[in-house]
Regions:
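A conserved beta-strand-loop-helix scaffold within acyl/acetyltransferase catalytic domains
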Residues: 3-85, 128-295, 399
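Acyl-donor binding region in acyl/amide transferases
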Residues: 73-159, 280-336
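Short helix-capping and inter-helix turn/linker motifs at the boundaries of alpha-helical repeat units
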Residues: 238-239, 298, 358-359
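Short, charge-rich amphipathic alpha-helical segments embedded
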Residues: 385-404
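Active-site/acyl-donor-binding loops of N-acyltransferases
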Residues: 140-177, 318-366, 370-371, 403
């Protein structure tokens, strides 16, 4: 098994046809592992990233049979820098994983694990992993207790008790009425009544984002979302809004976003962002925002019902509510899938190989310089020396290192 490292956008662009072929064949594949979504996301993130590509042959023109996209972070702990490997889709993707042609797992996953163990990292964060259990077991088997600590991360919210490792989804039949018949009689009647409000010309209407309205509609969505979540998330909200705006804008340009807005006359009431996977025929509900001061028909139920009806009419077979087992999702005829967050750490908390990853030298230099400027000289010196352990002649580290 040959493993290549792809770490530039031009090289990633050249993978499109091969990637799509593996994606279409892989039953575990989902939108956040698609070439189209990742090509936008990788161009957005600031930390170093790479994709491991596996070939079953040493021939240069042999096709890849599997891909593992990852990103590298730099952390400071106990006056030393270490690296952490994250799935490339973090922290925007609700699902991550390994893309693999069926039948190749038993060769590919061990080869990926061996490659990872030759890298420099202290923690491997397998966050939001949506993979079959055999694939997960095969991967984790290569990080035994003798050399690594493995822990499962619980994702149940302390405030709302929502389990963010549970992901409800509705399997969609080919006919809208057949879908309604899957629901309780009360829900069925409620949805029909609410959709009549927007189907019949009147005070309520739904618009769907176009190139001319996407900025306005995203502003509506994110403004409502910010108002709701600022009390709980604090200043983090601003970072999340910037990231979500960039990701959703790129997704819209790539024809991956369905964004309906509910209006009462000229007043926007709510907007709902859903990602579209045309290859796997799935709608993935990503986020919503609504006017919390509106006291009337439930905007969320209206927009979800409208979106599900639209999905069925266009031949989609799944409506995925993504992470979180919020009670309202269960009125839409859903099943559940469980994702996992497994953390693999080195025993001593230091990078494998004792050195930082070369790709993170710019990050370590930047952070060490900031520490230096703040008067935290011991930590800064450690950072400069860690850079020189990898690049002994690094001019920036040599210049900034205090004289002995």
């Amino acid at each position: 098994m040959r493993i290549d490292v792809i770490d530039t956008l031009p090289d990633f662009a050249r993978l499109e046809e091969n990637w799509n072929a593996v994606y279409d064949a892989d039953p575990d594949a989902q939108l956040f592992m698609s070439w189209k979504w990742l090509s936008g996301w990788l161009g957005q993130i600031s930390s170093p990233w790479f994709v491991l590509g596996a070939k079953a042959s040493e021939k240069a023109d042999a096709p890849y049979v599997a891909f593992l996209p990852m990103r590298i972070q730099t952390k400071l702990e106990n006056a030393r820098f270490h690296n952490e490997l994250n799935m490339a889709g973090n922290f925007s993707a609700d699902y991550t994983g390994v893309l693999c042609a069926p039948g190749a797992e038993h060769q590919v996953i061990p080869a990926f694990a061996r490659h990872l163990k030759r890298m420099n990292w202290a923690r491997l964060n397998l966050e939001n992993i949506r993979m079959s259990e055999p694939r997960i077991r095969l991967l984790l088997a290569h990080f035994p207790k003798a050399g690594f600590q493995t822990s499962e991360i619980n994702r149940i919210g302390k405030v709302d008790n929502i389990d963010n490792n549970l992901c409800p989804f509705a399997a969609l039949p080919p006919d809208w009425n057949a879908y309604l018949n899957m629901l309780s009689s009360n829900t069925r009647q409620k949805i029909r009544r609410l959709l009549r409000l927007v189907d019949e010309t009147g005070e309520y209407r739904i618009t769907v984002a176009t190139p001319e309205t996407i900025e306005r509609d995203l502003n509506t969505l994110l403004r409502f979302w910010e108002i709701k979540w600022t009390p709980r998330k604090g200043d983090l909200v601003h970072t999340l809004i910037r990231s979500n705006r960039a990701m959703l804008t790129r997704s819209f340009r790539a024809d991956l976003l369905f964004l309906p807005t509910l209006w009462k006359e000229d007043r926007p009431l709510a907007a709902l962002a859903t990602l579209i996977d045309r290859r796997k025929h799935a709608f993935l509900f990503y986020m919503t925002g609504r006017d919390e001061t509106f006291d009337g028909p439930p905007p969320g139920v209206i927009l979800h019902s409208h979106s599900i009806r639209h999905a069925i009419a266009n031949g989609f077979t799944e409506y995925d509510f993504l992470r979180g087992n919020e009670p309202y999702k269960y009125s839409f005829g859903v099943k559940e899938r469980r994702i996992r967050y497994v953390m693999v750490s080195t025993k001593n908390g230091l990078n494998l190989g004792g050195k930082i990853d070369q790709r993170t030298i710019p990050d370590v230099l930047t952070e060490s310089t900031e520490l230096h400027q703040k008067g935290r000289l011991v930590e800064a010196e450690h950072g400069y020396r860690q850079v020189m352990d990898v690049e002994p002649k690094n001019a920036d580290a040599i210049h900034r290192l205090p004289p002995v």
